[in-house]
Amino acid sequence: MARVKSGKVTRRRHKKILKLAKGYWGAKSKLFRVANQAVMKSLMYAYIGRKLRKRDFRRLWITRINAAARAYGISYSRFINGLKKAGIEINRKMLSEMAIHDEKAFAELVNIAKQQLNA
């Protein structure tokens, strides 16, 4: 049976990892084994970070909506409850943008929510 040499394959794999490790400090950008560990860890952190970003933005939107709703004399939870009862399905991102950029429309939504809660 013929001997299989994997020099080209290994070199390509090493180059790929070292390219991903570019900019890392010290051995993490030079030595394959250390760079491989650093790259694997960084990819793991990136994956987790993409999940956390969604949570963070949702929290930010809710905080903004709450602040804007309280300016009109209603809490966030009562505001959302009123909108649900009114059958208005606007997501929190859009509500947050409306609270910042379109105060008249947001005030209308607050009035609708208050009417539904009083009814």
Swiss-Prot record:
Signal peptide: none annotated. SUPFAM superfamilies: Ribosomal protein L20 (SSF74731). Keywords: Ribonucleoprotein, Ribosomal protein, RNA-binding, rRNA-binding. Coiled coil: none annotated. It comes from the Bacteria. HAMAP family: Ribosomal_bL20. PANTHER family: 39S RIBOSOMAL PROTEIN L20 (PTHR10986). GO terms for cellular component: ribonucleoprotein complex; ribosome. One of its GO terms (molecular function) is rRNA binding. This is Large ribosomal subunit protein bL20. Binds directly to 23S ribosomal RNA and is necessary for the in vitro assembly process of the 50S ribosomal subunit. It is not involved in the protein synthesizing functions of that subunit. GO terms for biological process: ribosomal large subunit assembly; translation. Belongs to the bacterial ribosomal protein bL20 family. Pfam families: Ribosomal_L20.
